[in-house]
Swiss-Prot record:
The keyword Nucleotide-binding appears for this protein: yes
HAMAP family according to UniProt: GatC
Name of the featured protein: Aspartyl/glutamyl-tRNA(Asn/Gln) amidotransferase subunit C
Reaction equations catalysed: L-glutamyl-tRNA(Gln) + L-glutamine + ATP + H2O = L-glutaminyl-tRNA(Gln) + L-glutamate + ADP + phosphate + H(+); L-aspartyl-tRNA(Asn) + L-glutamine + ATP + H2O = L-asparaginyl-tRNA(Asn) + L-glutamate + ADP + phosphate + 2 H(+)
Cystines in this chain: none
Amino acid sequence: MSSISRDEVAHLARLSRLSLTDDELDEFADQIDGIIEHVQKVSNVDTEGVEPMSHPSDLAGVMREDEVHPTLTAEQALDQAPASQRDRFEVPRILGE
């Protein structure tokens, strides 16, 4: 069974722009090894004669006609908002200019 090395985890962290401590590198290497082990177990399951499926249930999508129901007006929806502008919620900027 192949296992992922600490150096490979460090390489993945660099590619992902993550800064990991030595303890985190060891911990993640162990976790990834566990994941790989589980995937290998699933890969070894005998699926001979099992038809491929996209969903474990035979349920089909149930369609219905859209029904219009009363909704809040913009004024009602914004009534308790801390800030609004032009009938929209105003929120603090989280991304740069």
